[in-house]
């Protein structure tokens, strides 16, 4: 499974801002516990590169990428430190071309027909749409998907736990990005259980997962309770009872 497929399967791409690289592994493990195995660590802080390296070296199940990449220098450093994909807020031909030439997955920000055509010219099929709330959200992406049917979007900015399902349901959406599943304040405070819960909620909302009734066939009550607890851990469908 390639990077693009991993992002689509995850549905939600956490945008992670870390002030201290020592929190990187714990944040990654919290995301994994919530069913999310991709993360975008942004170059908004000086800890970005070291955070990427820490996750790449200690969390083999996590696909870690670099976000807010605005220069070629940042791009090269991110890849050197272990980033498997690059996300940029806008379209910079130098950054995108370097990634394409070096086999690095890249998702540049594209909100206009001109930017989308530039991305397509370099062989891209998935672009970032940022900030989605400012540039028209779903209606704008739907309009752009008319002439650019081969392009899919990863909107960021304006996506949250309440509307993620609406975004994911649109055929032109590849995945969504956002920081609401891993708030910077919760990372700094060590509230990693909350981050895990937010990821589970986001995944359930993205998948449109609802439960009316579950029938569990087990040999005894103890086994059935264990199964129910596992389902609750995965989907937060309610505390299991005998």
What are these regions (language model features)?
Residues 31, 167, 227-232:
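Conserved active-site tyrosine of GNAT-family acetyltransferases
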Residues 17-22, 66-72, 88-92, 108-113, ...:
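Glycine-rich beta-to-alpha transition loops that act as phosphate-gripper elements at the mouths
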Residues 32-37, 58-62, 80-86, 101-107, ...:
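Glycine-enriched alpha-helix->loop->beta-strand junction motifs that scaffold or abut catalytic
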Residues 89-95, 128-138, 172-194:
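Glycine-rich phosphate-binding active-site loops on the catalytic face of alpha/beta enzymes
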Residues 3-17, 203-228, 234-235:
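N-terminal beta-strand motif that seeds the catalytic metal site of vicinal oxygen chelate
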Residues 240-242:
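Conserved small/polar residues in nucleotide/adenosyl-binding loops
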């Amino acid at each position: 499974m390639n990077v693009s497929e991993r992002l689509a399967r995850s549905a939600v791409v956490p945008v992670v801002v870390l002030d201290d690289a020592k929190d990187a592994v714990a944040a990654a493990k919290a995301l994994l516990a919530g069913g999310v195995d991709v993360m975008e660590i942004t170059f908004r802080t000086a800890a970005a590169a070291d955070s990427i390296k820490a996750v790449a070296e200690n969390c083999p199940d996590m696909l870690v990428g670099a976000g807010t990449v605005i220069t070629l220098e940042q791009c090269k450093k991110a890849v050197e430190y272990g980033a498997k994909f690059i996300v940029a807020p806008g379209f910079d031909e130098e950054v995108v071309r370097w990634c394409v030439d070096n086999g690095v997955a890249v998702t540049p920000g594209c909100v206009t027909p001109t930017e989308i055509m530039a991305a397509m010219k370099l062989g891209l099929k998935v672009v970032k749409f940022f900030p989605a709330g400012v540039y028209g959200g779903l209606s704008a992406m739907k309009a752009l998907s008319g002439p650019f049917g081969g392009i899919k979007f990863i909107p960021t900015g304006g996506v949250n736990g309440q509307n993620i399902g609406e975004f994911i349901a649109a055929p032109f959406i590849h995945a969504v990005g956002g920081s609401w599943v891993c708030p910077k304040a919760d990372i700094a405070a060590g509230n990693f259980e909350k981050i895990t819960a937010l990821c589970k909620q986001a995944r359930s909302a993205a998948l449109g997962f609802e439960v009316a009734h579950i029938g569990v066939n087990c040999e005894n009550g103890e086994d059935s309770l264990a199964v129910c607890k596992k389902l609750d851990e995965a989907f937060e469908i309610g505390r299991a009872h005998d």
